[in-house]
């Protein structure tokens, strides 16, 4: 059995005329269970596209993604999306809903319309409250998310991703637009999930210092290709060398 929970084999997306290349071009990489991996690169390098391809949100013209040794296809995609939580850039919360209601939205994919017609089951609500408490948001559970700070909103988004009990968490620029304190809160939350629960975390980041502090391994992309894969030591030098 493979040691890898994620395997990408020669991923390629459609050719983009404005770029004169595919967004992803022959991408191959492997990620082990329990790793904290950061994706780095300039704007347009393909970081977010690679992340989204891991849950079938990007059409590929070539290559395969394997999750837990199984090739991704339309038949098993629902199961993969239960095993892989996704934290979108900006959180993707519904501002008119409360924190707990946004967290419960993470259960929509596993509940039928009939099950949610009269509200979510009590066990779902208890789990949502438990997750918010773990993230220091219990007292804000019934507050509209539009009233929360950026860091609080991002932690609500993390709780929403966690309510499906994923094995893997993907975070697309989770600190974008946050101040220093909120950024630290969000990254500490991801680090705790990784360290205490053994969760596999893959995050797209721009700050090399934050990447070096929290991640175990870095993958640097340039023009749709992987140009570096390895330790987070001396990332500044690696980034400069590989983006010249």
UniProtKB/Swiss-Prot annotation:
CDD domains in the cross-refs: ABC_PhnC_transporter
Transmembrane segments: none
EC number: 7.3.2.2
GO MF entries: ABC-type phosphonate transporter activity; ATP binding; ATP hydrolysis activity
Keyword list, A-Z: ATP-binding, Cell inner membrane, Cell membrane, Membrane, Nucleotide-binding, Phosphonate transport, Translocase, Transport
GO cellular component, one term: plasma membrane
Domain ABC transporter: 6-244
Signal peptide: none
SMART domains documented for this protein: AAA
Reactions mediated catalytically: phosphonate(out) + ATP + H2O = phosphonate(in) + ADP + phosphate + H(+)
Enzyme class, broadest EC rank: translocase
InterPro entries cross-referenced by the UniProt entry: AAA+_ATPase (IPR003593), ABC_transporter-like_ATP-bd (IPR003439), ABC_transporter-like_CS (IPR017871), ABC_transpr_LolD-like (IPR015854), ABC_transpr_PhnC (IPR012693), P-loop_NTPase (IPR027417)
Pfam family, one: ABC_tran
Domain of life assignment: Bacteria
Location of the protein in the cell: Cell inner membrane
Binding site for ATP: 41-48
Keyword Transcription attributed: no
Lipid bilayer topology: Peripheral membrane protein
Assembly, per entry: The complex is composed of two ATP-binding proteins (PhnC), two transmembrane proteins (PhnE) and a solute-binding protein (PhnD).
Family: Belongs to the ABC transporter superfamily. Phosphonates importer (TC 3.A.1.9.1) family.
Function according to Swiss-Prot or TrEMBL: Part of the ABC transporter complex PhnCDE involved in phosphonates import. Responsible for energy coupling to the transport system.
Listed name of the protein: Phosphonates import ATP-binding protein PhnC 2
Organism: Nostoc sp. (strain PCC 7120 / SAG 25.82 / UTEX 2576)
Biological classification of the source: Bacteria, Bacillati, Cyanobacteriota, Cyanophyceae, Nostocales
């Amino acid at each position: 059995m493979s040691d890898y929970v994620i395997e990408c084999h020669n991923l390629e997306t459609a050719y983009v005329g404005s770029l004169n290349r595919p967004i992803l071009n022959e991408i191959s990489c492997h990620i082990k269970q329990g790793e904290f991996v950061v994706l780095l690169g300039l704007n347009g390098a393909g970081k977010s596209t690679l992340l989204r391809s891991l849950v079938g949100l990007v059409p590929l013209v070539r290559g395969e993604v394997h999750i837990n040794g199984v090739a991704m296809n339309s038949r098993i995609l629902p199961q993969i999306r239960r095993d892989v939580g996704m934290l979108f850039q900006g959180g993707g919360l519904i501002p008119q809903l409360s924190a707990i209601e946004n967290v419960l939205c993470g259960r929509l994919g596993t509940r039928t319309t009939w099950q949610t017609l009269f509200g979510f089951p009590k066990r779902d609500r208890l789990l949502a409250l438990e997750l918010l408490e773990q993230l220091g948001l219990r007292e804000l559970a019934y507050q509209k998310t539009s009233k929360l700070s950026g860091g609080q909103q991002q932690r609500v988004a993390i709780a929403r991703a966690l309510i499906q009990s994923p094995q893997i968490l993907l975070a697309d620029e989770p600190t974008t637009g946050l101040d220093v304190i909120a950024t630290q809160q969000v990254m500490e939350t991801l680090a705790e999930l990784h360290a205490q629960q053994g969760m596999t975390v893959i995050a797209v980041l721009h700050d090399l210092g934050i990447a070096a502090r929290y991640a175990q391994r870095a993958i640097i992309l340039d023009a749709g290709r992987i140009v570096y894969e390895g330790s987070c030591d001396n990332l500044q030098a690696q980034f400069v060398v590989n983006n010249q």
